[in-house]
Protein backbone atom coordinates (compact mmCIF):
# COMPACT_ATOMS: atom_id res chain seq x y z
CA UNK A 1 0.00 0.00 0.00
CA UNK A 2 1.18 3.52 -0.80
CA UNK A 3 2.14 5.25 2.43
CA UNK A 4 -0.81 7.20 3.80
CA UNK A 5 -0.92 9.76 6.60
CA UNK A 6 -3.80 10.64 8.91
CA UNK A 7 -6.45 12.50 6.93
CA UNK A 8 -9.19 14.99 7.67
CA UNK A 9 -12.21 13.27 6.15
CA UNK A 10 -15.70 14.65 5.59
CA UNK A 11 -18.70 12.47 4.68
CA UNK A 12 -21.76 14.26 3.34
CA UNK A 13 -25.28 13.93 4.66
CA UNK A 14 -28.38 15.80 3.51
CA UNK A 15 -30.63 16.51 6.48
CA UNK A 16 -34.28 17.24 5.81
CA UNK A 17 -35.22 18.06 9.42
CA UNK A 18 -33.37 18.85 12.65
CA UNK A 19 -34.44 15.57 14.31
CA UNK A 20 -34.62 13.34 11.24
CA UNK A 21 -34.78 9.64 12.14
CA UNK A 22 -31.96 7.43 10.97
CA UNK A 23 -34.64 4.90 9.99
CA UNK A 24 -36.10 7.09 7.22
CA UNK A 25 -33.67 5.42 4.84
CA UNK A 26 -30.25 3.81 4.98
CA UNK A 27 -28.23 6.84 3.88
CA UNK A 28 -27.63 8.37 7.32
CA UNK A 29 -26.73 4.96 8.71
CA UNK A 30 -24.32 4.41 5.81
CA UNK A 31 -22.55 7.67 6.63
CA UNK A 32 -22.28 6.77 10.32
CA UNK A 33 -20.90 3.29 9.63
CA UNK A 34 -18.33 4.61 7.18
CA UNK A 35 -17.32 7.30 9.68
CA UNK A 36 -16.89 4.66 12.38
CA UNK A 37 -14.72 2.57 10.06
CA UNK A 38 -12.37 5.48 9.33
CA UNK A 39 -12.24 6.36 13.03
CA UNK A 40 -10.97 2.84 13.72
CA UNK A 41 -8.05 3.21 11.32
CA UNK A 42 -4.65 2.89 13.03
CA UNK A 43 -3.65 6.01 11.08
CA UNK A 44 -5.87 8.16 13.29
CA UNK A 45 -8.07 9.89 10.72
CA UNK A 46 -10.22 12.81 11.83
CA UNK A 47 -13.77 12.25 10.57
CA UNK A 48 -16.85 14.47 10.49
CA UNK A 49 -20.26 14.46 8.84
CA UNK A 50 -20.87 17.39 6.50
CA UNK A 51 -24.44 18.58 6.02
CA UNK A 52 -25.16 19.86 2.51
CA UNK A 53 -28.61 21.36 3.25
CA UNK A 54 -29.66 24.48 5.16
CA UNK A 55 -31.23 22.47 8.02
CA UNK A 56 -29.78 23.59 11.36
CA UNK A 57 -27.47 21.22 13.23
CA UNK A 58 -28.77 20.83 16.79
CA UNK A 59 -28.69 18.42 19.72
CA UNK A 60 -31.84 16.84 18.28
CA UNK A 61 -29.77 14.76 15.87
CA UNK A 62 -30.41 11.07 16.61
CA UNK A 63 -26.79 10.02 17.07
CA UNK A 64 -23.87 10.77 19.38
CA UNK A 65 -22.65 14.08 17.96
CA UNK A 66 -19.55 14.05 20.14
CA UNK A 67 -18.45 10.79 18.57
CA UNK A 68 -19.78 11.64 15.10
CA UNK A 69 -19.68 15.45 14.83
CA UNK A 70 -21.73 17.14 12.13
CA UNK A 71 -20.79 20.45 10.52
CA UNK A 72 -22.05 22.77 7.79
CA UNK A 73 -20.14 22.67 4.51
CA UNK A 74 -19.14 26.33 4.76
CA UNK A 75 -17.68 25.76 8.22
CA UNK A 76 -15.32 22.95 7.15
CA UNK A 77 -14.59 23.60 3.49
CA UNK A 78 -11.04 24.75 4.33
CA UNK A 79 -10.33 21.96 6.81
CA UNK A 80 -10.69 18.79 4.71
CA UNK A 81 -8.21 16.60 2.89
CA UNK A 82 -10.96 14.36 1.49
CA UNK A 83 -14.70 14.87 1.05
CA UNK A 84 -16.72 11.71 0.43
CA UNK A 85 -20.01 12.66 -1.19
CA UNK A 86 -22.45 10.06 0.12
CA UNK A 87 -25.74 11.34 1.52
CA UNK A 88 -25.86 14.86 0.12
CA UNK A 89 -24.58 16.29 -3.14
CA UNK A 90 -22.40 19.38 -3.29
CA UNK A 91 -22.87 22.01 -5.98
CA UNK A 92 -20.72 22.90 -8.96
CA UNK A 93 -19.50 26.01 -7.13
CA UNK A 94 -18.62 24.02 -4.00
CA UNK A 95 -16.84 21.45 -6.14
CA UNK A 96 -14.70 24.12 -7.82
CA UNK A 97 -13.78 25.56 -4.43
CA UNK A 98 -12.60 22.20 -3.07
CA UNK A 99 -10.69 21.34 -6.22
CA UNK A 100 -8.92 24.70 -6.18
CA UNK A 101 -7.58 24.07 -2.69
CA UNK A 102 -6.53 20.49 -3.46
CA UNK A 103 -9.19 18.60 -1.54
CA UNK A 104 -9.86 15.13 -2.96
CA UNK A 105 -13.49 14.51 -3.88
CA UNK A 106 -14.89 10.96 -3.84
CA UNK A 107 -18.35 9.91 -4.99
CA UNK A 108 -19.58 7.07 -2.76
CA UNK A 109 -22.44 5.43 -4.65
CA UNK A 110 -24.72 3.39 -2.42
CA UNK A 111 -28.03 3.63 -4.29
CA UNK A 112 -29.35 2.03 -7.50
CA UNK A 113 -29.48 5.38 -9.25
CA UNK A 114 -29.87 3.98 -12.76
CA UNK A 115 -33.08 2.17 -11.80
CA UNK A 116 -34.38 5.12 -9.80
CA UNK A 117 -33.64 7.52 -12.64
CA UNK A 118 -35.36 5.52 -15.36
CA UNK A 119 -38.37 4.96 -13.11
CA UNK A 120 -38.55 8.73 -12.56
CA UNK A 121 -38.47 9.22 -16.33
CA UNK A 122 -41.00 6.53 -17.22
CA UNK A 123 -43.46 7.11 -14.37
CA UNK A 124 -42.93 10.89 -14.19
CA UNK A 125 -41.77 10.85 -10.60
CA UNK A 126 -40.60 14.40 -10.00
CA UNK A 127 -37.04 14.56 -8.72
CA UNK A 128 -35.98 17.82 -10.33
CA UNK A 129 -33.01 18.66 -12.55
CA UNK A 130 -29.98 16.42 -12.15
CA UNK A 131 -26.48 17.85 -11.61
CA UNK A 132 -23.92 15.54 -13.23
CA UNK A 133 -20.66 16.24 -11.44
CA UNK A 134 -17.64 15.32 -13.59
CA UNK A 135 -14.93 16.53 -11.21
CA UNK A 136 -14.56 13.57 -8.86
CA UNK A 137 -11.16 12.08 -8.09
CA UNK A 138 -12.70 8.63 -7.59
CA UNK A 139 -16.05 6.86 -7.85
CA UNK A 140 -16.63 4.17 -5.24
CA UNK A 141 -19.57 1.82 -5.76
CA UNK A 142 -20.83 -0.76 -3.27
CA UNK A 143 -21.29 -4.34 -4.60
CA UNK A 144 -25.10 -4.47 -4.72
CA UNK A 145 -25.44 -1.57 -7.14
CA UNK A 146 -22.56 -2.50 -9.44
CA UNK A 147 -24.70 -4.58 -11.82
CA UNK A 148 -27.40 -2.00 -12.44
CA UNK A 149 -25.57 1.31 -12.06
CA UNK A 150 -21.79 1.05 -12.43
CA UNK A 151 -21.69 1.91 -16.15
CA UNK A 152 -24.31 4.61 -15.63
CA UNK A 153 -22.00 6.29 -13.10
CA UNK A 154 -18.80 5.86 -15.10
CA UNK A 155 -20.21 7.10 -18.41
CA UNK A 156 -21.90 10.22 -17.06
CA UNK A 157 -19.07 11.11 -14.67
CA UNK A 158 -16.29 10.24 -17.15
CA UNK A 159 -14.28 8.19 -14.69
CA UNK A 160 -13.85 4.43 -14.07
CA UNK A 161 -15.69 3.11 -11.02
CA UNK A 162 -14.12 1.15 -8.19
CA UNK A 163 -16.11 -1.53 -6.37
CA UNK A 164 -15.72 -1.09 -2.61
CA UNK A 165 -16.78 -3.28 0.32
CA UNK A 166 -20.17 -2.91 1.97
CA UNK A 167 -19.99 -1.64 5.58
CA UNK A 168 -22.45 -2.21 8.43
CA UNK A 169 -22.50 -1.96 12.20
CA UNK A 170 -25.08 -3.00 14.83
CA UNK A 171 -24.81 0.30 16.73
CA UNK A 172 -28.00 1.87 15.32
CA UNK A 173 -29.90 -1.36 15.78
CA UNK A 174 -28.71 -1.73 19.37
CA UNK A 175 -29.54 1.88 20.20
CA UNK A 176 -33.08 1.33 18.94
CA UNK A 177 -33.63 -2.01 20.72
CA UNK A 178 -32.08 -1.15 24.09
CA UNK A 179 -35.45 -0.87 25.85
CA UNK A 180 -37.25 -3.64 23.95
CA UNK A 181 -37.88 -7.09 25.46
CA UNK A 182 -34.70 -9.18 25.17
CA UNK A 183 -33.13 -6.08 23.56
CA UNK A 184 -35.02 -6.87 20.37
CA UNK A 185 -33.53 -10.34 19.94
CA UNK A 186 -35.68 -13.24 18.77
CA UNK A 187 -37.22 -15.58 21.30
CA UNK A 188 -39.64 -18.44 20.58
CA UNK A 189 -43.09 -17.23 21.61
CA UNK A 190 -46.68 -18.39 21.90
CA UNK A 191 -48.05 -21.73 22.98
CA UNK A 192 -47.14 -24.95 21.25
CA UNK A 193 -49.84 -26.70 19.24
CA UNK A 194 -50.68 -29.87 21.20
CA UNK A 195 -50.98 -31.84 17.96
CA UNK A 196 -47.70 -30.80 16.35
CA UNK A 197 -45.72 -29.62 19.37
CA UNK A 198 -44.75 -26.48 17.43
CA UNK A 199 -45.52 -22.84 18.15
CA UNK A 200 -47.55 -21.03 15.44
CA UNK A 201 -45.52 -18.39 13.62
CA UNK A 202 -46.06 -14.75 12.78
CA UNK A 203 -44.74 -13.95 9.31
CA UNK A 204 -43.65 -10.52 8.12
CA UNK A 205 -42.82 -9.02 4.73
CA UNK A 206 -41.15 -5.60 5.06
CA UNK A 207 -40.09 -4.56 1.56
CA UNK A 208 -40.27 -0.79 0.83
CA UNK A 209 -42.61 -1.32 -2.15
CA UNK A 210 -41.50 1.87 -3.88
CA UNK A 211 -39.83 0.29 -6.91
CA UNK A 212 -39.22 -3.04 -8.64
CA UNK A 213 -36.06 -3.79 -6.67
CA UNK A 214 -37.66 -4.68 -3.33
CA UNK A 215 -41.34 -5.53 -3.64
CA UNK A 216 -43.67 -7.67 -1.55
CA UNK A 217 -45.42 -9.84 -4.15
CA UNK A 218 -43.03 -12.82 -4.34
CA UNK A 219 -42.78 -13.07 -0.53
CA UNK A 220 -46.60 -13.00 -0.45
CA UNK A 221 -46.69 -15.96 -2.84
CA UNK A 222 -44.18 -17.85 -0.69
CA UNK A 223 -46.32 -17.26 2.39
CA UNK A 224 -49.46 -18.29 0.51
CA UNK A 225 -48.05 -21.62 -0.64
CA UNK A 226 -46.74 -22.40 2.84
CA UNK A 227 -50.14 -21.50 4.31
CA UNK A 228 -51.86 -23.92 1.91
CA UNK A 229 -49.58 -26.68 3.18
CA UNK A 230 -49.46 -25.88 6.91
CA UNK A 231 -52.63 -23.90 7.52
CA UNK A 232 -53.52 -21.67 10.44
CA UNK A 233 -52.13 -24.07 13.00
CA UNK A 234 -48.61 -23.17 11.87
CA UNK A 235 -49.05 -19.63 10.54
CA UNK A 236 -51.01 -17.41 12.89
CA UNK A 237 -50.69 -14.20 10.82
CA UNK A 238 -48.86 -12.43 7.99
CA UNK A 239 -48.11 -8.72 8.17
CA UNK A 240 -47.08 -6.89 5.01
CA UNK A 241 -45.69 -3.45 5.85
CA UNK A 242 -45.43 -0.45 3.51
CA UNK A 243 -48.43 -1.91 1.67
CA UNK A 244 -51.55 -0.16 2.92
CA UNK A 245 -51.57 2.11 -0.14
CA UNK A 246 -51.43 -0.94 -2.42
CA UNK A 247 -54.29 -2.69 -0.62
CA UNK A 248 -56.45 0.45 -0.86
CA UNK A 249 -55.58 2.03 -4.19
CA UNK A 250 -54.03 -0.52 -6.56
CA UNK A 251 -56.66 -2.47 -8.52
CA UNK A 252 -53.99 -4.80 -9.89
CA UNK A 253 -52.62 -5.60 -6.43
CA UNK A 254 -56.09 -6.04 -4.94
CA UNK A 255 -57.20 -8.38 -7.72
CA UNK A 256 -54.18 -10.62 -7.17
CA UNK A 257 -54.19 -10.87 -3.39
CA UNK A 258 -57.94 -11.02 -2.69
CA UNK A 259 -58.15 -14.68 -3.75
CA UNK A 260 -55.15 -15.85 -1.74
CA UNK A 261 -56.19 -18.26 1.00
CA UNK A 262 -54.13 -16.46 3.63
CA UNK A 263 -56.01 -13.24 2.81
CA UNK A 264 -59.48 -14.78 2.43
CA UNK A 265 -59.20 -16.43 5.84
CA UNK A 266 -58.30 -13.16 7.55
CA UNK A 267 -54.71 -14.17 8.31
CA UNK A 268 -53.02 -11.28 6.46
CA UNK A 269 -52.82 -7.53 7.12
CA UNK A 270 -51.48 -4.83 4.82
CA UNK A 271 -50.18 -2.03 7.02
CA UNK A 272 -48.14 1.16 6.78
CA UNK A 273 -44.55 2.05 7.54
CA UNK A 274 -42.81 0.82 10.70
CA UNK A 275 -39.23 0.92 11.88
CA UNK A 276 -37.64 -2.49 11.59
CA UNK A 277 -36.44 -3.21 15.16
CA UNK A 278 -39.75 -2.50 16.89
CA UNK A 279 -41.86 -4.32 14.31
CA UNK A 280 -39.66 -7.41 14.50
CA UNK A 281 -39.78 -7.43 18.28
CA UNK A 282 -43.54 -6.90 18.57
CA UNK A 283 -45.04 -8.68 15.57
CA UNK A 284 -42.61 -11.11 13.94
CA UNK A 285 -41.07 -14.57 14.13
CA UNK A 286 -40.08 -15.12 10.49
CA UNK A 287 -39.28 -12.58 7.75
CA UNK A 288 -39.75 -13.36 4.04
CA UNK A 289 -37.86 -11.18 1.58
CA UNK A 290 -37.23 -10.80 -2.14
CA UNK A 291 -34.92 -8.48 -4.06
CA UNK A 292 -34.20 -7.97 -7.74
CA UNK A 293 -30.82 -6.36 -8.41
CA UNK A 294 -30.04 -5.22 -4.84
CA UNK A 295 -28.54 -8.25 -3.13
CA UNK A 296 -27.16 -6.58 0.02
CA UNK A 297 -29.17 -4.48 2.40
CA UNK A 298 -28.98 -3.27 5.99
CA UNK A 299 -32.40 -4.81 6.55
CA UNK A 300 -30.94 -8.28 5.94
CA UNK A 301 -28.36 -7.74 8.66
CA UNK A 302 -30.81 -6.23 11.15
CA UNK A 303 -33.10 -9.25 10.87
CA UNK A 304 -30.33 -11.84 11.10
CA UNK A 305 -28.19 -10.14 13.76
CA UNK A 306 -31.06 -10.43 16.22
CA UNK A 307 -31.78 -14.04 15.34
CA UNK A 308 -35.00 -13.86 13.35
CA UNK A 309 -35.51 -16.53 10.70
CA UNK A 310 -34.92 -14.86 7.33
CA UNK A 311 -36.12 -16.33 4.02
CA UNK A 312 -34.38 -14.46 1.20
CA UNK A 313 -32.77 -14.53 -2.25
CA UNK A 314 -29.90 -12.06 -1.66
CA UNK A 315 -27.02 -13.94 -3.28
CA UNK A 316 -24.31 -11.55 -2.02
CA UNK A 317 -25.04 -12.78 1.52
CA UNK A 318 -26.37 -16.24 0.76
CA UNK A 319 -24.74 -17.57 3.93
CA UNK A 320 -27.29 -15.67 6.00
CA UNK A 321 -30.69 -17.02 6.98
CA UNK A 322 -32.52 -19.45 4.71
CA UNK A 323 -31.54 -18.77 1.11
CA UNK A 324 -33.41 -19.43 -2.14
CA UNK A 325 -32.10 -18.61 -5.61
CA UNK A 326 -33.54 -15.88 -7.81
CA UNK A 327 -37.29 -16.22 -8.26
CA UNK A 328 -37.38 -19.88 -7.22
CA UNK A 329 -40.53 -19.66 -5.14
CA UNK A 330 -40.72 -23.43 -4.58
CA UNK A 331 -37.35 -23.40 -2.83
CA UNK A 332 -38.46 -20.32 -0.91
CA UNK A 333 -41.51 -22.25 0.28
CA UNK A 334 -39.38 -25.20 1.35
CA UNK A 335 -37.07 -22.86 3.27
CA UNK A 336 -40.04 -21.21 4.98
CA UNK A 337 -41.52 -24.56 5.96
CA UNK A 338 -38.14 -25.63 7.32
CA UNK A 339 -37.96 -22.46 9.43
CA UNK A 340 -41.52 -22.95 10.70
CA UNK A 341 -40.80 -26.53 11.71
CA UNK A 342 -37.20 -26.41 12.89
CA UNK A 343 -35.92 -22.87 13.55
CA UNK A 344 -36.74 -22.99 17.25
CA UNK A 345 -34.77 -26.19 17.73
CA UNK A 346 -31.52 -24.18 17.81
CA UNK A 347 -32.48 -20.51 17.74
CA UNK A 348 -29.47 -19.50 19.83
CA UNK A 349 -27.04 -21.36 17.57
CA UNK A 350 -28.68 -19.76 14.55
CA UNK A 351 -28.16 -16.25 15.98
CA UNK A 352 -24.51 -16.97 16.75
CA UNK A 353 -24.01 -18.27 13.19
CA UNK A 354 -25.61 -15.13 11.72
CA UNK A 355 -23.39 -12.80 13.70
CA UNK A 356 -20.28 -14.72 12.72
CA UNK A 357 -21.25 -14.45 9.04
CA UNK A 358 -21.83 -10.69 9.36
CA UNK A 359 -18.41 -10.02 10.94
CA UNK A 360 -16.79 -9.47 7.54
CA UNK A 361 -19.05 -6.45 6.94
CA UNK A 362 -18.52 -4.73 10.29
CA UNK A 363 -17.05 -1.22 10.55
CA UNK A 364 -14.69 -2.56 13.22
CA UNK A 365 -13.33 -5.37 11.01
CA UNK A 366 -9.57 -4.82 10.71
CA UNK A 367 -9.40 -6.27 7.21
CA UNK A 368 -12.14 -3.95 6.03
CA UNK A 369 -10.44 -0.94 7.63
CA UNK A 370 -7.22 -1.83 5.85
CA UNK A 371 -9.01 -2.12 2.49
CA UNK A 372 -10.48 1.35 2.87
CA UNK A 373 -7.13 2.85 3.86
CA UNK A 374 -5.71 1.35 0.66
CA UNK A 375 -8.56 2.92 -1.31
CA UNK A 376 -7.80 6.29 0.28
CA UNK A 377 -4.11 5.90 -0.51
CA UNK A 378 -4.90 5.25 -4.18
CA UNK A 379 -6.84 8.51 -4.30
CA UNK A 380 -4.53 10.69 -2.24
CA UNK A 381 -1.23 9.32 -3.49
CA UNK A 382 -1.89 8.22 -7.09
Language model: regions and residue ranges:
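Conserved catalytic-core segment of nucleotide-activated headgroup transferases in glycan assembly
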Residues: 23, 27-30, 148-151, 158-267
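C-terminal alpha-helical cap of glycosyltransferases
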Residues: 359-382
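Donor nucleotide-activated moiety binding/catalytic core segment of transferases
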Residues: 244-306
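A short, charged/proline- and glycine-enriched loop
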Residues: 2-15, 78-79, 194-203
Amino acid sequence: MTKLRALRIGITIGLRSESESIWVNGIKQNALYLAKLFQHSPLGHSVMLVNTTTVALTDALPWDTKRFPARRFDDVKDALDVLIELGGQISDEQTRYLKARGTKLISYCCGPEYVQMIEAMIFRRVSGPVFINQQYDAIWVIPQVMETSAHFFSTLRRLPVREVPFVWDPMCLQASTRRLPFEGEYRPGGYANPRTGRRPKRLAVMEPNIDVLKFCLYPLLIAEQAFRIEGGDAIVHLHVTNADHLARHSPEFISIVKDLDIVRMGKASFVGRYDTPHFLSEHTDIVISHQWGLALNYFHFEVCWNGFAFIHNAHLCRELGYFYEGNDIETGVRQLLHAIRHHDNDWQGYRAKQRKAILRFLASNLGLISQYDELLADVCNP
